[in-house]
């Protein structure tokens, strides 16, 4: 079978031939339909993050945003033809309470592998195997968009963790602010705008018009905020202090500055990972005081569990195809991997399709 693999010693992506995997007892064989490409994949391909190969191998099959169809149920409770999206993390060894509880998204580093990212092969191949517990069903009508489930699950986790942090009182949020207009930021904005949690949404970027990302923001009903014209501490006076902020930029200063944009009792979740070390100058006393006296919170959020994937699949089923189509700027075959990984101002989400 064909697979797209990273050889980290170069680093280089290659299309290679690998044996079709044989499912072990309790695993199903999945035929890959499509795999989304995000910023993490590009950083992995460039050798900036992840890229650890499985034991005894010299390459890593990349790709973690996948949708596939059950080819061989192999005695599991799945049926041939079921459309599924795979989770990303797998436990290292046995005895993980996080794995036993279905909470690998909260497991400490070193206790898991991440398929297509580090330590375990991913899904950018014609077939892969997985246990049913690491697969989430998707409506057949959304099979062409199932690669959105994994990134959308991050938004669902952020909302879940935020609601848990505010479950001790009658919190009534009405506004949300997405920091970053890359593919995750635009997907997050789309989820927040089409959901029923918030009445108003905003999205931060650094683009001049005309621009396809600004078009997406405004077409779904959000308000574009240019960070070159308006700082985060100025944002509340011009627009409003927001109840929820979802950071995707990986810009270290945003971990601090986003708090300025929050309303009392507001929450910011951090999803972006900085590419390098950076020094941020702040008034520590004012920052500390603001968090305390206005009950604000900062949460780090990474990965997602099965319940978040299910919530993402439910959202996907209800979202118009036209909205999802606006987020996809290129679909390529596995032999067009250079084109699929190319990035430009016009790029939002690119996809590798194994049905081409």
UniProtKB/Swiss-Prot annotation:
GO molecular function: D-glucose binding; glucose 1-dehydrogenase (NAD+) activity; glucose 1-dehydrogenase (NADP+) activity; NAD+ binding; NADP+ binding; zinc ion binding
Binding annotation for Zn(2+): 38, 64-65, 150
Binding positions (substrate): 40, 114, 150, 303
Amino-acid biosynthesis recorded as keyword: no
Domain of life the protein comes from: Archaea
Gene3D superfamilies named among the record's database cross-references: Medium-chain alcohol dehydrogenases, catalytic domain, NAD(P)-binding Rossmann-like Domain
Binding site for NADP(+): 181-184, 206-207, 301-303
Gene Ontology biological process: non-phosphorylated glucose catabolic process
Keyword field contains Repeat: no
UniProt cofactor(s): Zn(2+)
Keywords: Carbohydrate metabolism, Metal-binding, NAD, NADP, Nucleotide-binding, Oxidoreductase, Plasmid, Zinc
EC number: 1.1.1.47
Main EC class the enzyme belongs to: oxidoreductase
Catalytic activity: D-glucose + NAD(+) = D-glucono-1,5-lactone + NADH + H(+); D-glucose + NADP(+) = D-glucono-1,5-lactone + NADPH + H(+)
Family, as annotated: Belongs to the zinc-containing alcohol dehydrogenase family. Glucose 1-dehydrogenase subfamily.
Function summary: Catalyzes the NAD(P)(+)-dependent oxidation of D-glucose to D-gluconate via gluconolactone. Can utilize both NAD(+) and NADP(+) as electron acceptor. Is involved in the degradation of glucose through a modified Entner-Doudoroff pathway.
Protein name, entry field: Glucose 1-dehydrogenase 2
Gene: gdh2
